[in-house]
């Protein structure tokens, strides 16, 4: 849904009728995610929708950078900490007492912890594209994956696959960087960051995770046709 919105808002530059499709997609996404109770995805959809309405370039840039930093910090200090987060008094206070949320993020910390225990056993190559039964047998009886994209990458292809994905990200960012002042470019980059944040708590197919990077890489061609 987030990449559909990102693509829609990019196409508005070609034809204003795409704005109608964007609004319809945004409403459908918000309503459906609210009904199923997917709060992380719902929050990112709403945040991206509001972000596209901001007219100030500097503010959009600051929000983009801040959101990316939050993504990095959460991945390293929360996800990579696994169940260790439950022993952190500050984290317990912020999440349980202030936010009134479950410190396990609906048992996701159990899945992260299980993944972090098995990844070191095959850190270079990973375990390939395994099925649900493999997760249940090697990680947890409730696991159908680590519910985190980076951990899934490490499980599937180890450090090699993570480096490969990072290189693709680097090429995509480097390609769109000269156009960073464009509103459309900022919207596209922010939609990608929102997808990454959603992937902190979920697992998405590689095609979904690679799609916005492909658009970013080819942004210069898109810009030329506009």
Show which residues each predicted segment covers.
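Membrane-interface micro-motifs in multi-pass membrane enzymes
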Residues: 1-2, 38, 146, 154-158, ...
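Alpha-helical transmembrane segments of multi-pass inner-membrane proteins
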Residues: 1-55
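Hydrophobic transmembrane alpha-helices and their immediate junctions
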Residues: 16-21, 54, 60-63, 156-196
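Short, aromatic-rich membrane-interface segments at the entry and exit
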Residues: 18-21, 40-44, 60-66, 204-211
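Lipid-exposed faces of alpha-helical membrane segments in multi-pass integral membrane proteins
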Residues: 24-31, 43-51, 69-73, 160-170, ...
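A membrane-periplasm/extracellular boundary helix in multi-pass inner-membrane enzymes
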Residues: 27, 33-36, 53-98, 116-121
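Long extracytoplasmic/lumenal interhelical loops at the membrane interface
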Residues: 96-157, 178
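Transmembrane alpha-helices of multi-pass inner-membrane enzymes
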Residues: 187-226
